[in-house]
């Protein structure tokens, strides 16, 4: 599905309604000030800059014959002239060099490419790092791999759902740091890991980078090893424009005031350098922009690309909206949402009419005859203390034989979302709720999210349940699926559940607990939590024995000022036993439902698969670990997990090194994907790599994920509650693809929201000090993981008070020797050696440019207290959807 045009009704600035700003002048293909354009011959058509796209028929035939290749385009955020698509065989990505070869495709588009002749392939020098490939990857690691959620101030996150925890991803592109690195040099073949990168000075800032690390082939290709060549291609067709064609950025006047273009157009410069510069009609711009352009130098605008012709070097756009001042949270947030195609408009009256109208709503009497009545059972929710959309509840009843009746009860959202209704259509299009640090953009109207569907305590609710008979060791003796009615007896927070786990024999004072319904006691709830915890520990242990993988990464939680909304502080979120308890049972329910719907509908089940790591990147990581002397086994997910959990000690240095290696291990990981079982022939492709299970799906978060709503419908059909789902396998696959796209966009938006708030925090509360560990060494800089805040930064030697610095290799390991200028004449210059995994102390400080901050290495001998102690208050978020899962 392509992006909806729900925001196109934003009125272009200065343009009356009904006046189109799409049509452009005949000379718009000329660069500003291009004098030749004024004297262009009129005898023929203007020369094209871009190739004409191939016909659909030729593309289809070429894909069938294998002469063309399709893939999702990734543009390097650090070097916008470099782009890639994945190689179908998992080998090195296919390289697309330059804007012309990209042929007007934008980041994220599904494109078709044609390989260039071999003499035009990219030559990767033996010392080349290939880090550009890595940098082009963006947010495609599944949440199932990570147990840490991305906590919010007061919201239960889409990625915080307890069944998604394992999937949290890592963005290896260091997107905050846009400095042009002109040369990447590998130390003895260690690729993609920033071990050693030769860079030309930072003085050029964002100046265009050179490409001296690679060249086109100018010699007999037979003399080159296969490893030194990277296949290169050009885009010949765009199968699907997945990029929103919207961007935030700044308005500028064209350079040549005497040109014809100057009198008609302004230049829009996107903040994201992967988006081309755009000509904008002056009639779209503020009326006084030409006379007072400096007044708008710091104003953020939204612009939409409306056309990009073959003979135009820049796209033509329409200015949609003025957002406000750059660097302020709300304008920046709206820009992020718009760029990633998030529909944040109010729900239409047609959608709202689909909701129950007579409020307060009560369960119709006939539902009691169709469902199992569990209202007398001790059922409760465990969520962040401020969560409002409670879509999962748990129960645990001891049996006389020593076993337990354990239930996972999920809000029956599908009851309130009629298939084919306007509500269903908008939910399918949005596909996911989008969670920002300060707010949520819901998939469904709040009446459903927070009231009718939310499993609020002491209120009758419609649910879909999975109930097992389990031994204390977690062995499944019996399993039941069905529609139910529950009445949650209390709303526990993770803190409440954690205190119960930590005090198994002590009674928790009533004043420290939330209200509990009179039918149940705090002791009963406490014992149920302890029983669930005991079983969850056994389930978890067995999962890892069976070969599951977990890559826990540092995640930030913010404390916000209630009046201003600005961040007051932040801390690394601690993922505790109460989080793990919920995660295990959500995983168990998702796996159980996956098997149930696949047995019932082997050709129509909506499942979730996780492909194994990318072969090329994984082999590079293996090589890196070997050279660094790290005994890490990458032969399987379970082997890797065992290496990460058993290789490192518990001292500060070992824990920091584990964090760095976890980041590196995340990079080769691929995205977990929804898919229709009938369209994959090989059942081996159904597998979930991180969980190491044959079948998996998402069932436990229907309030915030449309995929779960579809799975609920499939489960209902499998149980005979309704007719079979009226969706052909290819239609279901299209919806699955759309859910994948929107899920990725949502995760990227969440990351950018976190980055935005952290940048504001550095500006408002900085400088911030922290210990950091070196991840990679370059000739004139090095990369660090800032341990207190979980961010990665590059530290440049020429930004430090150094007398000199020297790069060298010791064996196969790179190192930088820094010679510091003495602070007074009587001191000798201090020498500091930087190696991979060095622990250093850094200062994060704001730069003059909005939302930019840099990392500065502290001078040796000045290390002291590293800033404020970690805040003790727990995150308001929930684990990252163990649904990886």
UniProtKB/Swiss-Prot annotation:
A GO molecular function assigned to this protein is: RNA nuclease activity
| Sites bearing Phosphoserine, chain numbering | 31, 173, 875
Q: Which disease is it linked to?
A: Perlman syndrome: An autosomal recessive congenital overgrowth syndrome. Affected children are large at birth, are hypotonic, and show organomegaly, characteristic facial dysmorphisms (inverted V-shaped upper lip, prominent forehead, deep-set eyes, broad and flat nasal bridge, and low-set ears), renal anomalies (nephromegaly and hydronephrosis), frequent neurodevelopmental delay, and high neonatal mortality. Perlman syndrome is associated with a high risk of Wilms tumor.
The protein depicted here goes by the name DIS3-like exonuclease 2
State the organism named in the record.
Answer: Homo sapiens (Human)
Task: Identify the enzyme class.
Answer: hydrolase
Q: Which residues form a coiled coil?
A: none
| Keyword Phosphoprotein set for record | yes
Record remark on domains: Specifically recognizes and binds polyuridylated RNAs via 3 RNA-binding regions (named U-zone 1, U-zone 2 and U-zone 3) that form an open funnel on one face of the catalytic domain, allowing RNA to navigate a path to the active site.
Q: Which Pfam families match?
A: Dis3l2_C_term (PF17877), OB_Dis3 (PF17849), RNB (PF00773), Rrp44_CSD1 (PF17216)
Q: Where is this site: Important for catalytic activity?
A: 391
| Comp. bias (Acidic residues) | 870-885
What does the protein in this record do? Answer: 3'-5'-exoribonuclease that specifically recognizes RNAs polyuridylated at their 3' end and mediates their degradation. Component of an exosome-independent RNA degradation pathway that mediates degradation of both mRNAs and miRNAs that have been polyuridylated by a terminal uridylyltransferase, such as ZCCHC11/TUT4. Mediates degradation of cytoplasmic mRNAs that have been deadenylated and subsequently uridylated at their 3'. Mediates degradation of uridylated pre-let-7 miRNAs, contributing to the maintenance of embryonic stem (ES) cells.
UniProt lineage: Eukaryota, Metazoa, Chordata, Craniata, Vertebrata
Indicate the quaternary assembly: Interacts with XRN1.
The record's family statement is: Belongs to the RNR ribonuclease family. DIS3L2 subfamily.
Instruction: Tell where it localizes.
Output: Cytoplasm; Cytoplasm, P-body
GO cellular component terms? cytoplasm; P-body
Task: List the InterPro entries hit by this protein, alphabetically.
Answer: Dis3_CSD2, DIS3L2, Dis3l2-like_C, NA-bd_OB-fold, RNase_II/R, RNase_II/R_CS, RNR_Ribonuclease, Rrp44_CSD1
Supply the EC number(s): 3.1.13.-
